[in-house]
């Protein structure tokens, strides 16, 4: 082989092994755009799109409470197929730093649970078994998970 052929093969080999951004495979925003994931708001869900998806089967909002496993969750299934992660609004709570999904409810990777840090007035002192609505935490969670009963049950 001639020196030109060997040199050409070496250059071709280096081009194949390099991690440069070429015209064919360059992502939008350039090579460094992959380092900074774009955060977006989670998809809207629930009646009147008043909630946000917190998982494939959880939809929570201040006005609707938390809906788990209801027909309104079809939109939340789409979240898994979107390329960028979503970010929920609200302060972080719980052991896995999930978001406050609704007043008094913290949702994380393992599901949702009652959390006094998520109440609207978390600075006020309340007895552990009663809240300002006059219901036990269990009753409050049931009311949040079943918002259709709100018309009949007044706080």
Swiss-Prot record:
PANTHER family: ISOTOCIN (PTHR11681:SF5), NEUROPHYSIN (PTHR11681)
Cellular location(s): Secreted
Domain of life from the UniProt record: Eukaryota
Residue pairs linked by disulfide bridges in the UniProt entry: 21-26, 42-86, 45-59, 53-76, 60-66, 93-106, 100-118, 107-112
Modified sites of kind Glycine amide: 29
UniProt main location, coarse: secreted
Name of the protein described by the UniProt record: Vasotocin-neurophysin VT 2
Source species: Catostomus commersonii (White sucker)
Signal peptide: 1-20
Taxonomic lineage: Eukaryota, Metazoa, Chordata, Craniata, Vertebrata
Annotated function: Vasotocin is an antidiuretic hormone.
Record has Secreted as a keyword: yes
Family: Belongs to the vasopressin/oxytocin family.
Alphabetical UniProt keywords: Amidation, Cleavage on pair of basic residues, Disulfide bond, Hormone, Secreted, Signal
């Amino acid at each position: 082989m001639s020196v030109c052929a060997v040199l050409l093969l070496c250059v071709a080999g280096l081009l194949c092994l390099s991690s440069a951004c070429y015209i064919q495979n360059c992502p939008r925003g350039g090579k460094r755009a992959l380092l900074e994931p774009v955060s977006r708001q989670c998809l809207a869900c629930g009646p009147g799109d008043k909630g946000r998806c917190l998982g494939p089967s959880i939809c929570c909002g201040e006005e609707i409470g938390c809906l788990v496993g209801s027909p309104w969750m079809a939109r939340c299934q789409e979240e898994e197929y979107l390329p960028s992660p979503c970010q929920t609004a609200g302060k972080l709570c719980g052991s896995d730093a999930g978001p406050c999904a609704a007043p008094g409810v913290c949702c994380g990777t393992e599901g949702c649970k009652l959390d006094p840090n998520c109440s609207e007035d978390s600075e006020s002192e309340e007895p552990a078994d009663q809240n300002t609505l006059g219901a036990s935490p269990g009753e409050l969670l049931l009311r949040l998970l079943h918002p259709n009963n709100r018309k009949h049950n007044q706080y």
